[in-house]
Amino acid sequence: MKVGFLSDKNGFRAPLHPDSLKKYDKTQLFVDKDIFKNLELNAKDYKKLKPLNKTSLKQMDVVCFVDTVEISDIKGLKRDAAVVGLFDAKAKKEIKKVRPDISLYDFFQLPRISRAQNLDALSSQANLLGYSSVLRASLETSNVIPMMTTAAGNISPAKVLILGIGVAGLQAIATAKRLGARVWGYDVRADVKDQVESLGAKFVEASSTSQD
């Protein structure tokens, strides 16, 4: 079976890691030339892998990607090939319309059950998203995040409100707390209150009112 790996268009992730190479026959793996362009990975681990291009794409049985895939990326795939990754809803619809003869395996649709835990790429990516979101937000604020005592006086800790208490939200709360912020969390589901408070944050309860 020949497997191809497309590069992440944002350049920060890759669908293939060096540790995984030991499990596969390297002669059957093909990689996009830009797949590790912006990643701090050892390039020598990939020198033995064959290039994925318009010619070799026609031979692939499976193509894997992380970020997004467009019809132009897989236009040359043979009939009955499979594409595996995290699909954008719009792109997925277009691919199905143009190439109904190939199979699409969308990790966004993977059920979050114990048996599929080692395949739960969505949760792992959401976890990283929550972490990186707080770090990026901290760079945008004009104040420091933790409380600080200086010669000019005390600086109060930043106040952070996290909207949505899913995998990303919980990681965002944990990261903001570690940075020293005062954190609140909000979700339309009141039953996540315990999860928010278990991380040391306060849960924002909003009551809905209606007007006649």
Each model region followed by its residue ranges:
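N-terminal start-of-chain detector that recognizes signal peptides
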Residues: E40, T55-L57, S132-R136, I155, ...
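A short acidic, often aromatic-flanked loop/helix-cap motif at beta-alpha or helix-coil junctions
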Residues: T55-Q59, L110-R115, T209-D212
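Short, hinge-like loop/turn segments at secondary-structure boundaries
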Residues: Y46-K50, A121-Q125, A201-E205
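Glycine/serine-rich phosphate-binding loop and adjoining beta1-alpha1 elements at the start
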Residues: K2, S72-P157
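Residue-level detector of short coil/turn "hinge" positions at structural boundaries
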Residues: K48-N53, L104, V183, F203
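Glycine-rich phosphate/diphosphate-binding loop of Rossmann-like nucleotide-binding domains
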Residues: S7-L41, P146-D212
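An N-terminal-biased, well-structured beta-alpha scaffold segment characteristic
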Residues: K2-D101
